């Protein structure tokens, strides 16, 4: 799944900090600290980051597109 532009619950724009979140997560930082630094404060917005799958820097969408 491609990361959403807005939070599904509150509609806040969250995609603007996704690349930094992804980079810092890849570097081994704690996800809670990253979201705090990026000032993602609402639980609904934080859930969008926590539930988005990243395995070996690949998103679920990257796996699905191989079978189109």
From Swiss-Prot:
Protein's job: DNA-dependent RNA polymerase (RNAP) catalyzes the transcription of DNA into RNA using the four ribonucleoside triphosphates as substrates.
Gene: rpo10
Subunit structure: Part of the RNA polymerase complex.
Cofactor dependence: Zn(2+)
Tree of life domain: Archaea
Catalytic activity line of the entry: RNA(n) + a ribonucleoside 5'-triphosphate = RNA(n+1) + diphosphate
Gene Ontology CC terms: cytoplasm; DNA-directed RNA polymerase complex
Cofactor note: Binds 1 zinc ion.
InterPro entries: RNA_pol_su_RPB10, RNA_pol_suN_Zn-BS, RPABC5/Rpb10
Protein's name in the database: DNA-directed RNA polymerase subunit Rpo10
PROSITE patterns linked: RNA_POL_N_8KD
Predominant localisation class: cytoplasm
Species per Swiss-Prot/TrEMBL record: Methanococcus maripaludis (strain C7 / ATCC BAA-1331)
